Amino acid sequence: MSSGGLLLLLGLLTLWAELTPVSSKDHPEFCELPADSGPCRGILHAFYYHPVHRTCLGFIYGGCYGNANNFKTIDECKRTCAA
């Protein structure tokens, strides 16, 4: 491969690395999901990871369905998503 081709390849790889979200490298994809209380009407205090603020926040979980970005404790949320 010519030096021009190698430079082009290096440039494309650098661009790809810059455009790849850092969050996908640091924690599971479900940490990017929004808080989802679910359709049930329970009042359970839970925590979810907020990817923009890069921290765990509290929310009210209804008790069913929702998504995987749902933790019983803030420590569990931090260990899973904010590490």
Curated annotation (Swiss-Prot):
It is found in: Secreted. It comes from the Eukaryota. The keyword Metal-binding does not apply. GO terms for molecular function: serine-type endopeptidase inhibitor activity. Transmembrane segments: none annotated. Disulfide bonds join C31-C81, C40-C64, C56-C77. Its main location: secreted. The keyword Signal applies. Residues 1-24 form the signal peptide. SMART domains: KU. The record marks R41, G42 as: Reactive bond for trypsin. One of its GO terms (cellular component) is extracellular space. Expressed by the venom gland. It holds the Pfam family Kunitz_BPTI. Keywords: Disulfide bond, Protease inhibitor, Secreted, Serine protease inhibitor, Signal. Residues 31-81 form the BPTI/Kunitz inhibitor domain. Serine protease inhibitor. PANTHER family: KUNITZ-TYPE PROTEASE INHIBITOR-RELATED, SERINE PEPTIDASE INHIBITOR, KUNITZ TYPE, 3. Belongs to the venom Kunitz-type family. This is Kunitz-type serine protease inhibitor scutellin-4. It comes from Oxyuranus scutellatus scutellatus (Australian taipan). The lineage of its organism: Eukaryota, Metazoa, Chordata, Craniata, Vertebrata.
